[in-house]
């Protein structure tokens, strides 16, 4: 179940638009719960959408291409608590893109089982040319690593394209770059 509009780039991955190797091709179904008109979570619709087959709830922290504000970690934590009160074993995954380092806590501090994002944005400090990250419970990270690579390899491999130096420089600079971006918003 997804609580937001999916990025158009994910429609083929999910199977909204048919594609070889999509989640739908693997038998994964998808339900989307729209936000209320004011951009907040529709708790009644979320409750109705969760059933015995629901294994994962995906929450997009940033507004993406929408006009709503981004969700705060506090709002995400409240939603996760609500979801887990209905189905405690459901995995709550947060697409954390653009949200890293903008608060003193991250979604994993308020109950998210898994957070994912792009290294090209905040965590890469503007220097990482490719990549993404997965963080969370050991089981979630391990399962995702095997889906992203192949059986037997898991998180032991991954593309770096010979740019590890840029990754490490980006990781080092990321908090300062993000702070600068936030400060520039205050002065605009």
Predicted feature locations:
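Conserved small/polar residues in nucleotide/adenosyl-binding loops
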Residues: 1-6, 186-188
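Conserved PLP-enzyme active-site core in the AAT-like
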Residues: 4-182
